[in-house]
């Protein structure tokens, strides 16, 4: 199966939402393209004295609801189309979450794993200096993404403050605690997945207690989703990472599985249960499936064999459009990525507000705010789906996109843009 062009996929999803809402074609034409895309050349001197150039981008899709917001990724396969698509998805994610943000995304085509610490810092500073004219506390607020972390955000912050000759701590989120970040940021996406899943389980499965869960992907999102779902009463029976997985119907301890992964390199070395592949985990007889690894793992080739009643998308784009049509017919409920994994950007908003007010907030207070937002958003999408769509024909993703696109459209209309 050929991977889908992410921009084609993003535009197809937008087209479907516009058609379901009954909007004119011009709405699609306006929203199918970003407000602007800046391409930059990042040239640095390597440790061995050679000079290398890397391409980078910042896409600003739409700011009708507020400043652009979205992460920056470092990856050898980043393309401009991917960055544009991701910025579009951030517009819908922020809109659906009820946050005062538009959508933005950045990327640099580089393999950060082969850079020295000095090279990584230089690359980060040069990239952020190159985009400094279009980002800002009230303009565009980047955050961590693939292979970027709080240290990279610290370099971004410092470089921006050097260029702008001020102290603008809200220009990026996902920072270390010492620079105005929040400890709760690391758990936020996984916790949000767990909360959204709990709301859906209470509505459609009679609750989470004793419900079996399989988690594909055991990085930050997968681990914390498993940890919090277990604390909420679910039984984790399978976990996997890129090197394999483990299935034990008697239950798996999420924290023990993490220790095994850290000490041996993979959760597949967990002391009990049956070893499985990272794709086999998708087809296990469980109540809830959490794909939290990579995109396009649930396809029209395996959708028929999926036995879960609820799929909660911890990863971005794990379910293809063709697969979702099959799942809808089977009656499988898919909590879409723009709903289920919005915990990270919601926590980023809490951090941003805190930075702007010069205030402070405890981790417990931050997680409580996040929980309230995730519960509210999940209930809103489910209610809209039941009230305005046909569950046997339409997915929760349809409902989520319709809500998100309608909010952006109304904001643009009110502001006189269209």
From Swiss-Prot:
Pfam families per UniProt: ELFV_dehydrog, ELFV_dehydrog_N
Cellular compartments annotated: Cytoplasm
UniProt key word RNA-binding: no
E.C. number: 1.4.1.3
Active site residues of this protein: 105
Keyword list, A-Z: Cytoplasm, NAD, NADP, Oxidoreductase
Major localization listed first in the record, in broad terms: cytoplasm
An example Gene Ontology molecular-function term: glutamate dehydrogenase (NADP+) activity
Superkingdom of origin organism: Archaea
GO terms for cellular component: cytoplasm
Catalysed conversion reaction: L-glutamate + NAD(+) + H2O = 2-oxoglutarate + NH4(+) + NADH + H(+); L-glutamate + NADP(+) + H2O = 2-oxoglutarate + NH4(+) + NADPH + H(+)
Annotated residues for binding of NAD(+): 217-223
Enzyme class: oxidoreductase
InterPro entries, A to Z: Aminoacid_DH-like_N_sf (IPR046346), Glu/Leu/Phe/Val/Trp_DH (IPR006095), Glu/Leu/Phe/Val/Trp_DH_C (IPR006096), Glu/Leu/Phe/Val/Trp_DH_dimer (IPR006097), Glu/Leu/Phe/Val_DH_AS (IPR033524), Glu_DH (IPR014362), NAD(P)-bd_dom_sf (IPR036291), NAD_bind_Glu_DH (IPR033922)
Biological processes, Gene Ontology terms: glutamate catabolic process
Subunit structure: Homohexamer.
Sequence similarity: Belongs to the Glu/Leu/Phe/Val dehydrogenases family.
Protein name: Glutamate dehydrogenase
The species this protein was found in: Aeropyrum pernix (strain ATCC 700893 / DSM 11879 / JCM 9820 / NBRC 100138 / K1)
């Amino acid at each position: 199966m050929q991977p889908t062009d992410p921009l084609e996929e993003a535009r197809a999803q937008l087209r479907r939402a516009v058609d379901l809402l009954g909007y004119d074609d011009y709405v699609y034409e306006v929203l199918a393209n970003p407000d602007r895309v800046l391409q930059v050349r990042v040239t640095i001197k390597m440790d061995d004295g050679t000079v290398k150039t890397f391409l980078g981008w910042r896409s600003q899709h739409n700011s009708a609801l507020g400043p652009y917001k979205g992460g920056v990724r470092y990856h050898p396969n980043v393309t401009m189309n991917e960055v544009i698509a991701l910025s579009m998805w951030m517009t819908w994610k922020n809109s659906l979450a009820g946050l005062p943000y538009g959508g933005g995304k950045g990327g640099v085509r580089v393999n950060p794993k082969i850079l020295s610490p000095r090279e990584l810092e230089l690359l980060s500073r040069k990239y952020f200096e190159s985009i400094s004219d279009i980002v800002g506390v009230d303009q565009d607020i980047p955050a961590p993404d693939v292979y970027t972390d709080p240290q990279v955000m610290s370099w971004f912050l410092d470089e921006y403050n050097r260029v702008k000759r001020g102290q603008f701590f809200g220009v990026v989120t996902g920072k270390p605690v010492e620079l105005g970040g929040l400890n709760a940021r690391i758990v936020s996406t996984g916790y949000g997945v767990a909360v959204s899943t709990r709301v859906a389980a209470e509505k459609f499965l009679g609750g989470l207690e004793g419900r079996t869960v399989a988690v594909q992907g055991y990085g930050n999102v997968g681990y914390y989703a498993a940890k919090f779902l277990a604390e909420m009463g679910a039984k984790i029976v399978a976990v996997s990472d890129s090197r394999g997985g483990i299935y034990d119907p008697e239950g798996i301890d999420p924290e023990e599985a993490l220790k095994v992964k850290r000490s041996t390199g993979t959760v597949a070395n967990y002391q009990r249960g049956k070893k499985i592949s990272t794709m086999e985990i998708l087809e296990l007889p469980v109540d809830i499936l959490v794909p939290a690894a990579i995109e396009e793992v649930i396809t029209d080739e395996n959708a028929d064999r999926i036995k879960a009643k609820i799929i909660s998308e911890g990863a971005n784009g794990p379910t293809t459009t063709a697969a979702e049509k099959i799942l809808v017919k089977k009656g499988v409920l898919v909590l879409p990525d723009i709903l289920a994994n919005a915990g990270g950007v919601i926590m980023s908003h809490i951090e941003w507000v805190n930075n702007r007010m010069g205030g402070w907030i405890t981790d417990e207070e931050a997680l409580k705010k996040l929980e309230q937002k995730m519960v509210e958003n999940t209930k809103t999408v489910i209610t809209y789906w039941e009230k305005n769509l046909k569950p046997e024909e339409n997915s929760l993703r349809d409902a989520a996109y319709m809500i998100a696109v309608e909010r952006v459209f109304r904001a643009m209309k009110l502001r006189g843009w269209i």
